[in-house]
């Protein structure tokens, strides 16, 4: 919501070198700004990402309903919602639900095109692919997978069909490419830095952002095994906010898809076309996911491959349906798997209800909060000390203070009377230390001229940057806190010491 906030404040979509994320395509962020401006509340953005997620679920369900029984449709929806991180996406002002909806639409259109033909469907696929990339760069895997699907389906017409689909996709993405080129010097900012360059960026930040060289291949033989079994490993090890996979996709969404192969001969003639299409779209995206995970430390994160979710949901639901037609003897595999699936979904639903009941977001989002459930109390429940710390900045440092964040990338709730400099790449410390060769004391004292205070996310610094296995530059990061405390004094901290506000020593 940082860019929508700035967009509403200035009325202009300009470059912000202090935060590279604002250089990404901003289709959904503009919709957030439109909703917030229309209703006068930033919580109105919830209508956008909630609506996008609902549209995606309806598209998955509607596609399956055309080719399979109704209960198959409902199972696909349940498998998606069984992932804790997925349903949390409905509650967050982020772009993943839009990517999911566009991916579901692309799969639906591809299924229709493969069964009925028609150049108009190619135009629609290009439109959806271009929109998806204009929402999030990683949706480029969807565009590539659609191209592969067109090639496999009609190889003799691939040039003609490819030109139609790719031409439409590029035309739809063109405004964002031009914006990147004009404002940032890079049509795909901040990627491809070696080719295009880009303001506020350099080779070190490019390597650090993608965690180049820290992929699964760097883990030796065990990493190769994890790479081959990536969907299963991401399911087993994926937790919300985790380091390597960073997503809870649910127990069965991806693993259950294997059953469609085991029970292929038991699918009906109506079910096979959608299963083939889902598999055809999924395989190239899986290959790209594995390639990213092999070479990059963040490439294996499930949150980056949201376009695979509609295909996985359809294949898993169809595979489960095929199991119902397996022989019951000598062992009723279908009964066993059904019990396990039901148990997992019920447990997930219970956890969801508990979380929603505890957070109680409805009244706040709709502007109907109570004295016991105000906006401030809701934000404290959902963001913890982060919101409290930011609200203290003007009281502790004074109006007009310039605050540099350390190891804290989020600054949306920064008071209007304070200028906040978020640590978007968490490299306010590391970048000058590693790339400029500056001494620790020199870095801190160099802040004196343009910084009045520092907001230090000490809990994240200590638990993640100093202790988390696999996080690089632990020794260099460990130099920060002592250097900070030599020149600045603690003015405020929350009860748990998670966030601290520092000011200069006299």
Language-model regions, residue ranges each:
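Extracytoplasmic
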Residues: 394-449, 462-486, 493-494
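Membrane-interface transmembrane helices that cradle and orient dolichyl/undecaprenyl
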Residues: 65, 106-122
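Signature aromatic-anchored transmembrane alpha helix within multi-pass, membrane-resident enzymes
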Residues: 120-127, 143-147, 163-170, 314, ...
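Transmembrane alpha-helix segments characteristic
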Residues: 74-80, 124-129, 145-146, 170, ...
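Hydrophobic, aromatic-rich transmembrane alpha-helices
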Residues: 55, 60-61, 226-276
């Amino acid at each position: 919501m940082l860019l929508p906030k700035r967009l509403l404040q200035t009325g202009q979509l300009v470059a912000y070198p202090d935060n590279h994320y604002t250089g990404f395509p901003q289709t959904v962020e503009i919709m957030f700004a439109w909703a917030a401006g229309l209703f006068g509340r930033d919580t109105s953005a919830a209508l956008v990402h909630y609506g996008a997620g609902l549209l995606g679920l309806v598209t998955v369900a509607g596609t399956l309903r055309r080719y399979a029984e109704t209960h198959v449709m409902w199972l696909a929806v349940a498998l998606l919602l069984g992932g804790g991180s997925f349903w949390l996406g409905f509650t967050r002002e982020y772009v993943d639900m839009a990517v999911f909806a566009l991916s579901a639409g692309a799969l639906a259109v591809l299924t229709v095109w493969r069964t009925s033909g028609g150049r108009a469907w190619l135009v629609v696929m290009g439109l959806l692919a271009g929109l998806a990339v204009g929402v999030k760069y990683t949706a480029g895997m969807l565009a590539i997978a659609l191209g592969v699907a067109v090639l496999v389906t009609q190889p003799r017409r691939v040039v003609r069909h490819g030109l139609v689909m790719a031409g439409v996709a590029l035309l739809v993405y063109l405004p964002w490419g031009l914006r990147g080129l004009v404002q940032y010097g890079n049509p795909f900012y901040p990627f491809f830095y070696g080719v295009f360059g880009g303001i506020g960026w350099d080779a070190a930040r490019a390597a650090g952002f993608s965690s180049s060289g820290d992929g699964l291949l760097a883990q030796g033989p065990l990493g190769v095994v994890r790479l081959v079994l990536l969907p299963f490993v991401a399911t087993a090890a994926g937790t919300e906010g985790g380091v390597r996979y960073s997503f809870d996709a649910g127990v069965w969404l991806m693993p259950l898809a294997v059953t469609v192969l085991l029970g292929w001969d038991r699918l009906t003639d109506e079910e096979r076309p959608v299963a083939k299409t889902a598999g055809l779209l999924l395989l190239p995206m899986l290959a790209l996911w594995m390639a990213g995970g092999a070479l990059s430390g963040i490439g294996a994160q499930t949150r980056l491959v949201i376009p695979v979710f509609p295909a996985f949901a359809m294949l898993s639901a169809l595979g489960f349906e095929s199991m119902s037609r397996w022989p019951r003897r000598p062992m009723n595999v279908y009964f066993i798997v059904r019990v396990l699936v039901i148990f997992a979904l019920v447990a997930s639903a219970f956890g969801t209800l508990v979380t929603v009941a505890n957070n109680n977001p409805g009244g706040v989002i709709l502007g109907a909060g109570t004295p016991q459930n105000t906006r401030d109390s809701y934000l404290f429940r959902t963001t913890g000390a982060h919101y409290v710390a930011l609200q203290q900045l003007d009281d502790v440092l004074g109006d007009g203070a310039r605050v540099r964040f350390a190891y804290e990338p989020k600054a949306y709730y920064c008071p209007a009377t304070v200028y906040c400099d978020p640590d978007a790449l968490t490299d306010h410390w590391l970048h000058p230390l590693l790339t400029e060769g500056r001494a620790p004391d020199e870095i801190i004292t160099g802040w004196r001229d343009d910084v009045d205070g520092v907001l230090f996310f000490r809990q994240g610094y200590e638990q993640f940057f100093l202790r988390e296995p696999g996080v690089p530059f632990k020794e260099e990061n460990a130099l920060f806190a002592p250097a900070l405390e030599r020149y600045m004094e603690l003015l405020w901290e929350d009860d748990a010491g998670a966030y601290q506000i520092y000011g200069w020593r006299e």
